[in-house]
Structure formats: C-alpha cells, structure tokens
Amino acid sequence: MLSRLFAVLVFFVAIPSSVFAMTTCGGEVACSVRGGDYHIELPSDGDLRGVYVFFHGYKSSAKLQMLQRRLVDMTLAHHLAYVAVDGIEGSWSFPNSPQSGRDEKAFIADVFQDLHNRYGFSPDKTVIGGFSIGASMAWYTACQQGERTRAMVTFSGVFWNPLPKAADCVAAIPPIIHFHGTAEQTFPLSGRAIGTRFRQGNAFESIAIMRSRGKCDVAIARKVTLDGIQCDDVPRCIRGDSVMCIHNGGHEARADMLDAALTAIGFPR
C-alpha cells in the first residue's frame, strides 16, 4: 500500500505545474498569459468549431465584456468560443494610441498560443474582432500578425493617425468585415482628434490600406447585403473578401450584425 501511495505521489510531483495551470481557467476564472489575461466561454453543447477573440472598447475590461450577453450568446450560437481579451487600464497600447505600457503584439501572440495550447485553436479557426478602440486593436493585429487569424469582424474602430503604410502590414491580411455608422460620433468615419496629440484614423483610408496590401481587386467591387445593410465587397484578395458595411446608426456593435458576419465568413449557426 505504501509503495503504491509513494508511486502516486512521485507521479504528481513529476508533472510540471504548467500542466495543472492549463486546466484552471474559464468561466469566471481568467486565463493568464505573460503580460495579461483573457476570459473564455465555450458552447454548452460541446460543438466547438473555432474561437472569436474580441478586444473590448474604451474603459471596459474582459470581465465586463463577458456581460455583453447578446454578443457572447450569438458567438456561441455559431459554435465558436467567445474570448474577451483584457486591455490595460481600459484601453490598448497599439501604435499611435494614447495608451502605452505593454507590447500588445507580443501579448496577443501569447494569447493566440495559449488558446492553441489549451483548446487546440489553430489560425484557421481563429476570428478576431473588437469594438471602438478595441476594433482598432483588432486592425493592428490583422496588420501585424494576420497569418494567425482566419478572419476579422469589427465594429466602429480602425487605424489611428499616422496610418500605417500597406508595406507595414503582413501580406496575409485576413478576410475583413467591418461595420461603421454614419451617425457615429465617438469614432466617426473620418476619425477625430483625441486631445492635442492623437487622432483616430479615417475608416475608408484604413480599409484601402488593407485592400492594397491584400491585393484585392477594387475594379470588380460589388454590393452585398449583411443584416439589411448594403456593404461594399472587394473580392479576390490574397485570402478572401474585404467588406465594409456602412449603416445609419451610431457607436454600436449589434448581435444581428455579428450573426450575419460570422455566417458570411464560414461559421453558420
């Protein structure tokens, strides 16, 4: 009996602590990586086909984002896990952001790797998105490491000035669906100044950069309808279409928009 007990103890001592750490997050418990953390919720029926990695808006957090149940539940209905990544002091430290203090490219790369290690999410199963300044974080992620994502679905936020050049981004720009409102005042289509040193970018100029880098064929742009919104769809990019949906609303990220977008990029209900 003692020998068997000793063998069991040796077995557990021999297991690296990281193995136990891999099983201790989810739900109310944040998943920690170097530099920060994220929250995750999985579909309750076990039908898991991918993940939607979402960057929250200004003055929010991963924990608060998980309370946005319409977005979370819509994501789960499409058989995707919902991940809310935590910013720093309610914001994000991307290029030309008013916030600084963290290497977001490295941090987000660690989030992607952790999602792969814990849940097996590969780039072809990883969709990124965000709202407002969180959408900006998603745009810089697509620009800097788009090869690690399958697609991007964002709301009410793009690059900041000075805008990156097309050559600053990776060639593997993922397919994009972006929603932006004509009545938007927080992050207008043309952008706006934040204090005296910072300025949000122009949405049309931002997507033109992505289309240029992705070698999209703007000459054959067409109209498509998503959630009743007429969108500009530029096809034949290196990795898929680039879609801009301009609606008549304001600063919002609606679940019905997300529903249409996730279906369009290949994750139906």
What does each model-found stretch correspond to?
Residues 5-15:
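Sec-dependent N-terminal signal peptides
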Residues 24-123, 127, 137-140, 144:
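Serine-hydrolase catalytic machinery in alpha/beta-hydrolase-like enzymes
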Residues 178-180:
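Short beta-strand/loop motif that positions the catalytic acidic residue
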